[in-house]
Amino acid sequence: IIAGINISNTFKLLKTITNNDVLTIEINSKEFMDIEITSESKKTSTKFQLKLLDINESRIEVPDVNMTSVTILPSADFQRLCRDMSNIGNDIEITRAGKELRLRCEGDFANQETSIECPDESPEMTGLYSLRYLNIFTKATSMCSSVQIMQEEGNRFLILKYNVANLGELKFYMATKVPEDQ
């Protein structure tokens, strides 16, 4: 089944989930996705009907890519950094080199660079990404305590991977921005 959902709206509904709640997702029509959150301890059940987006249903195959660098950060810290940097600029430069991850942005009134020490070595790779979309993706923070920032040597894209308890994983793929002069 291919279903188009607005990630931002979906997270607005799912952020009420607690650790012991049961989440049920069903798609019975092309217009709505039914979401039910059940709490045994509170003896409550909340139902939502999320409107589905009308999308092109052709399948897009994501190629297998060897991700050269995997950096694990607390998801709340990464979300805060992205949110803070979006107050300064529109784009973030993510560089992994050696045992360091650097997050950098430039704006009209200020620049920011944050360096994070990493436990393992990595070849140098840099990519430029939209903070607008990263801030949407980091809304998955409420579902997972850590995020894996995955980069590949070709710098074609970035993957943010959230392992959601024993339910599975969320992966967000983001294309690297190409500078306007190229």
Predicted features and spans:
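Short, recurring structural edge motifs at helix starts
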Residues: P63-T68
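DNA polymerase processivity clamps
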Residues: I1-T46, S69-Q182
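Conserved loop-to-helix interface motifs that mediate assembly, gating, or partner/ligand docking
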Residues: I37-V62
